[in-house]
Amino acid sequence: MDKVTGYVTGVNGNLVAATFSGSVRKNEVGYVQVGDDRLKGEVIRVNGDTASMQIYEMTNGIQVGDRVELSGELMSVELGPGLLTQVFDGLQNPLPELAQQCGFFLQRGVYLDPIPNKDWEFTPLVKPGDHVTAGDAVGSVPEGLFTHLIMVPFGLKDEGWRVKSVREKGVYNVRDTVAVLENDNGEEKELTMVFSWPVKQPIRCYEERLRPDETLAVSYTHLRAHETEADLV
């Protein structure tokens, strides 16, 4: 599928207006080409064939006519083992890896995989033939004191999905297939330990929403300035 492209028609700070010849979605990720740099942004408004994008990098050098390419994907985060041991910037770039590649002065237009390409111990929680829906756990992976549940993607529609196959307990790469699902139509979906989720799309596959029932008590320092008539002279 060809990606939708367009060109810059206006720049105001970190906001860029662009005209496109194809379909554009709100919250879609796009890139402005400035020389050798591809600057990441998000569509925040669509009006006909014109879209307003918020660019999450320095916009120095962007000019009217610069090429813009849409990714076809919504602004998302990656979820999975390795997430808790990382330090990220606002685009989920791992800062230690960025520093190794760019030094102390980070360069714009550099984007790295959020989840490290490591091996983890996977324990299956389902067996072939089990019926599953969005949010069900198919396995678990320990990361320090925390246990990750490897879940059926939250956005998977309920179409009679069942487990076709699942890996035995063992050590696998985070992006290896650990389970395969199949629905009533014969469609298959491979699951790894990692999946992406749009940051502005609510998660609705929950059984119960827990609401707070206790007041959060915090301590603070109260500094009071005493003023006297002598202080004002």
Question: Residue locations for each model-derived region?
Answer:
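Conserved small/polar residues in nucleotide/adenosyl-binding loops
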Residues: 221-228
